[in-house]
Curated annotation (Swiss-Prot):
Residues 350-377 are annotated as: Disordered. Homodimer. Polymerizes to form a dynamic ring structure in a strictly GTP-dependent manner. Interacts directly with several other division proteins. GO terms for molecular function: GTP binding; GTPase activity. Keywords: Cell cycle, Cell division, Cytoplasm, GTP-binding, Nucleotide-binding, Septation. It is found in: Cytoplasm. The gene is ftsZ. It comes from the Bacteria. GO terms for biological process: division septum assembly; FtsZ-dependent cytokinesis; protein polymerization. InterPro entries: Cell_div_FtsZ, Cell_div_FtsZ_CS, FtsZ/CetZ, FtsZ_C, Tub_FtsZ_C, Tubulin/FtsZ-like_C, Tubulin/FtsZ_2-layer-sand-dom, Tubulin/FtsZ_GTPase_sf. Belongs to the FtsZ family. This is Cell division protein FtsZ. NCBIfam families: ftsZ. The keyword Thylakoid does not apply.
Length: 386
């Protein structure tokens, strides 16, 4: 006798914020109510975990730090994560994809994030890390810690995105508040996570499953993520331009990107010519040797809005001779033959251990300095300023 079997095809996506900065980034996404994603905060600081809005928390290294934090010592952060390795493994169990958010240069984020990534990879989980580098005024020692942490983290992730905090001043201007600056950077990570989640879970005209996402995201190396939202007659072009602009990310040559993932989310009013516009806008940034996955998601709540999410992976790796195009369920080679190449965006995190950052930024404001070159700012940011 045959019995009905319940099918569960949804991929499980988890976002782990490690340390003060990573925890703040994840808390930002929780408040934005992203659907289809599980959120966790990992920290040595018991007080920070008690205050967070993230529902699932893991305190690590209580036997080492007594819940008082890592004291800006990455070794303490690493040993703390090792001490509670089993708790981390249990939290990650069942995940298909994990995003790790952390601020580099301090104790917990720098030391524990590589351990979290290693635990995830040991379980065969697709692992992507998004980390922030400290301001230059925080000193050479903290920057050295950050570089060491990033190097160690890169050994255990499929894709790695880095964001120098110094880019916040250059791109957003010296008049912006500290909270607004970090919030803008966190919005980029939120958009990327949201875009991938929607790509997998929402119905669309061109459905993309998790296997397609894994194909792109497993291209080892540095990665870029970007998301843009626009309204009106030119919404497709404007959203695509925002998605491929990555002013807050590390300066990396994207011409060698080996994987490209594109998602277009809109209401039922999405037009064919808008789909083509997105493809043509991004086309100039495409690598000739990229595996490309494209898809659309329909959101009835987006009346006049159109959102484009772009992910480029495998940056800095050797180029492959072949070109692979993946458009699951329907073909769209005419529109997206060689999709993508350039800047997408990441996240930055508000590090609770860096109270001096606000004071230093204000002092620089008082001293005054030249505004960044107008033409150095991406078009969508110039439009907002004008």
């Amino acid at each position: 006798m045959f019995e009905p079997m319940e099918l569960t095809n949804d991929a499980v996506i988890k976002v782990i914020g490690v340390g003060g900065g990573g925890g703040n980034a994840v808390e930002h996404m929780v408040r934005e109510r992203i659907e289809g994603v599980d959120f966790f905060a990992v920290n040595t600081d018991a007080q920070a975990l008690r205050k967070t809005a993230v529902g699932q928390t893991i305190q690590i290294g209580s036997g080492i730090t007594k819940g008082l934090g890592a004291g800006a010592n990455p070794e303490v952060g690493r040993h703390s994560a090792e001490e509670d390795r089993e708790a981390l493994r249990a939290a990650l169990e069942g995940a298909d994809m994990v995003f790790i958010a952390a601020g580099m240069g301090g104790g917990t984020g720098t030391g524990a994030a590589p351990v979290v990534a290693e635990v995830a990879k040991d379980q065969g989980i697709l692992t992507v890390a998004v980390v922030a580098k400290p301001f230059n005024f925080e000193g050479k020692k903290r920057m050295a810690f950050a570089e060491q942490g990033i190097a160690e983290l890169s050994k255990h992730v499929d894709s790695l995105i880095t964001i120098p905090n110094d880019k916040l001043l250059k791109v957003l201007g010296r008049g912006i508040s500290l909270l607004d600056a970090f919030g803008a950077a966190n919005d980029v990570l939120k958009g990327a996570v949201q875009g991938i989640a929607e790509l997998i879970t929402r119905p669309g005209l061109m459905n993309v499953d998790f296997a397609d996402v894994r194909t792109v995201m497993s291209e080892m190396g540095y990665a870029m993520m970007g998301s843009g939202v626009a309204c009106g007659e030119d919404r497709a072009e404007e959203a695509a331009e925002m998605a491929i602009s990555s002013p807050l990310l590390e300066d990396i040559d994207l011409s060698g990107a080996r994987g490209v993932l594109v998602n277009i989310t809109a209401g039922f009013d999405l037009r064919l010519d808008e789909f083509e516009t997105v493809g043509n806008t991004i086309r100039a940034f495409a690598s000739d040797n990229a595996t490309v996955v494209i898809g659309t998601s329909l959101d009835p709540d987006m009346n006049d809005e159109l959102r484009v999410t772009v992910v480029a992976t495998g940056i800095g790796m050797d180029k492959r001779p072949e070109i692979t195009l993946v458009t699951n369920k329907q073909s769209s080679q005419r529109v997206m033959d060689n999709l993508y190449r350039d800047h997408a965006a990441g996240m930055s995190s508000l590090n609770q251990e860096q109270k001096t950052a606000a004071k230093a930024v204000n002092e620089q404001n008082a001293q005054g300095s030249k505004e960044p070159d107008y033409l150095d700012i991406p078009a969508f940011l110039r439009k907002q300023a004008d």
